[in-house]
Regions:
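Glycine-enriched, solvent-exposed interface loops adjoining structured elements
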Residues: 1-121, 182-329
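Autoprocessing Asn-cyclization modules and mimics
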Residues: 117-183
Length: 329
């Protein structure tokens, strides 16, 4: 879609000889346009919910909630959070890094849910290998490990996680990922049968909550606060100790990946689209947003080349030809 968007943008600009937008400028404008369109989904979702509550929304093909939710859920991911200190769980003391490019591979836009798994079932070392298997001839997995439990290869760098699909026998588990390619790796297993959801509170509120035994977070009703990089879970006690990878799972909406129009340069100096480049990245928004992306990019182009007519044209087209839900309200 990104090449189609760029070709349309250049066609509109060239029609009246407004100027040329370089690939680097286009990529910058494309990033901002996608972020704008992405954030509009959340504000539009709020308006749709309000319309449903007021009984003014449609159904079947007019069900805007369904269409918006499907697009939003494409960006909803689940990741185990990285503990503050891998090697010293006691130092971690319920502190985990929030999702980011360096810890989970995705930048978090909004955290939706935090689930804690406080119970560690067992730990040992594998002494056999097979694809998607954990083999430990000293183990007794039957009656202890259940489907859905979390297995962590602690010796891998970085540590890797997998979910138990099935207990094959007393010494062998079928896993969701092939995380034991060699023998001699240390592992542990966390129970997914015992879990509790944590509620977010503000840093100021947690102080007042902890002052009362009635309102203080407990192992049955935990809470968490967060800053720019870390999440702190409460209560901090011997009955609720979290410090291992696999003990805290976060469902969050990630930011879309930065779009990048990649190219090769011909002898005459003209850039030609080449999606085989390793840093190529298409837009992640659905095809129906192509028009919106074009109009938003044209607005940035108008500012860049100091042609107010381009920006005004794009704004008018966005409002008239394909109004967003927010503009209809």
């Amino acid at each position: 879609m990104i090449n189609s968007v760029r070709n349309t943008v250049l066609s509109v600009l060239n029609k009246n000889n407004y100027g040329y937008i370089s690939p680097s400028d286009f990529n910058l404008f494309a990033k901002q346009a996608q972020l704008e369109a992405y954030e509009e989904y959340f504000s539009n979702y709020n308006k749709v919910v309000n319309a449903e509550n007021a009984r003014t929304s449609g159904s079947d093909y007019a069900d805007l909630n369904k269409a918006i939710s499907e697009t939003m859920e494409y960006f909803l991911v689940d990741d185990f959070l990285q503990p503050f200190d891998y090697d010293n769980p006691s130092i971690t003391r319920n502190r985990f890094y929030i999702p980011s490019l360096t810890t989970t591979g995705n930048e978090s836009y909004m955290i939706n849910r935090v689930v804690c798994y406080p119970t560690k079932l067992t730990d040992s070392t594998n002494d056999g290998t097979a694809a998607f298997r954990l083999i430990d001839n000293t183990a007794t997995f039957l009656g202890l490990v259940n489907p859905g439990d979390i297995v962590v290869n602690w010796s891998a760098s970085p540590p890797q996680t997998a979910i138990v699909y099935y207990t094959l026998n007393n010494i062998e588990l079928l896993l969701s990922a092939d995380i034991f390619p060699v023998t001699g790796d240390d592992y542990y297993i966390i129970s997914a049968q015992e879990y509790v959801e944590s509620e977010k509170v503000s840093a100021g509120k947690i102080i007042s909550l902890n002052l009362s035994n009635i309102t203080a977070p407990s192992s049955m009703f935990p809470a968490y606060t967060q800053d720019n990089t870390l999440m702190q879970l409460y209560p901090i006690s011997t009955t609720f100790t979290l410090g291992l990878l696999g003990q805290v799972k976060c469902a969050y909406f990630r930011y879309p990946k930065e779009p990048k129009w990649t190219y090769i340069t011909l002898a005459a100096g003209e850039p030609i689209f080449d999606q085989s480049q390793p840093d190529y990245q298409d837009f992640e928004l659905p095809q129906e947003d192509e028009f919106k992306l074009i109009m938003k990019i044209l607005q940035y182009c108008g500012i860049s080349i100091r042609e107010s007519e381009v920006a005004q044209f794009a704004i008018a087209q966005e409002q008239h030809e394909q109004p967003t839900f927010s503009q209809q309200q």
